Amino acid sequence: MLHVHILSWVLAIILFIATYLNYSKTQGASPYYKPLHMALRLFMLLTLISGFWELIEEFMAASNGEGGNHMLLTLKMLCGLAVIAFMEISIAKRKKQQTSHKFFWITIILIIITMAIGVILPWGPISKIFGIS
């Protein structure tokens, strides 16, 4: 399920940037805007489902005495929810022709923070390199 989660958020980031850039302030939406936005929502939903599944698995492992990064996992979950919310807000503001650059950059910064937290979690590459679990 971890690979599904990683694949879904990578595709969601690519689709977010493509959707955001396919709406012009002068010409409006391109013909690709609506399918891209719907695919983005599909991958955001898949990211949410797989992320919650991973969170539940980690909490169940902790109840058996195996895990213990609840605070970091909860922080990553909150950052992930904020990323998805800011993705939708920035696209909606761009569609309404309001200033959306601030929300776009907030989303990019939150994506980087969420990815950094994910990298240092027990299933992340840094933990595997140094044998931290």
Swiss-Prot record:
Alphabetically ordered keywords of this record: Cell membrane, Membrane, Transmembrane, Transmembrane helix
Localization annotation: Cell membrane
Broad class of the protein's primary localization: membrane
UniProt cross-references to Pfam families, sorted A to Z: DUF1516
Positions of transmembrane segments: 1-21, 42-62, 71-91, 103-123
Record flagged with keyword Cell membrane: yes
Membrane topology per record: Multi-pass membrane protein
GO cellular component: plasma membrane
Recorded family membership: Belongs to the UPF0344 family.
The protein, known as: UPF0344 protein SERP0557
Organism of provenance: Staphylococcus epidermidis (strain ATCC 35984 / DSM 28319 / BCRC 17069 / CCUG 31568 / BM 3577 / RP62A)
